[in-house]
């Protein structure tokens, strides 16, 4: 099992210079960076090419995992060269559609008993403000 904290300067990964050219600006670019890493990884450990590749992540990886999987699937040259087979993708608690996901926080918290009816309107107000701010960028 290989754990990769990616993209650079997210989580515990640190490139050093946060203004470096290695900084990514999109999920697709992160997918390209990860494919480049995997290419070098398989050159170092060619025996692992025989193992099925599962890509997993949680939370904001809901943006990056699909991009990485798409990068692999669309790059038929890389697949043919490495002979690596993408066997599966899993995303836990993915942050894939923030505006729509925000819409259900109040209901989720209320139905789980985390927020009482007394505070539900307050949570709904903060939820609405969160959506407004999210859409503003």
Residue ranges and their predicted role:
Residues 2, 6-19, 24, 31, ...:
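Accessory cap/linker subdomain of secreted extracellular hydrolases
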Residues 5-7, 59-62:
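Catalytic nucleophile-elbow at a beta strand-turn-alpha helix junction centered on a G-D-S/GDSL motif
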Residues 23-35, 60-66:
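Phosphate/oxyanion-binding active-site loops and adjacent basic polyanion-contact surfaces
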Residues 32-51:
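Conserved acidic catalytic loop of the alpha/beta-hydrolase fold
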Residues 42, 55, 62-79, 89:
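Short glycine-enriched nucleophile-adjacent loop
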Residues 44-50, 76-80, 137:
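Surface-exposed helix-capping loop/turn segments at secondary-structure junctions
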Residues 46-60, 85:
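Alpha/beta-hydrolase fold nucleophile elbow
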């Amino acid at each position: 099992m290989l754990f990769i904290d990616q993209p650079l300067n997210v989580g515990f990964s640190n490139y050093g210079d946060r203004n470096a050219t290695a900084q990514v600006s999109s999920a697709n670019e992160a997918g390209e960076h990860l494919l480049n890493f995997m290419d070098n990884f398989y050159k170092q450990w060619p025996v692992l090419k025989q193992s099925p590749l599962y890509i997993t992540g949680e939370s904001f990886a809901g943006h990056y995992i699909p991009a990485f999987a798409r990068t692999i699937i669309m790059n038929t040259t890389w697949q043919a060269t490495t002979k690596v087979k993408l066997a599966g993708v899993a995303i836990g608690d993915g942050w894939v559609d923030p505006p729509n996901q925000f819409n259900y926080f109040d209901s989720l918290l209320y139905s789980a008993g985390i927020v009482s009816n007394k505070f539900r309107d307050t949570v709904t107000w903060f939820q609405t403000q969160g959506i407004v701010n999210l859409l503003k960028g």
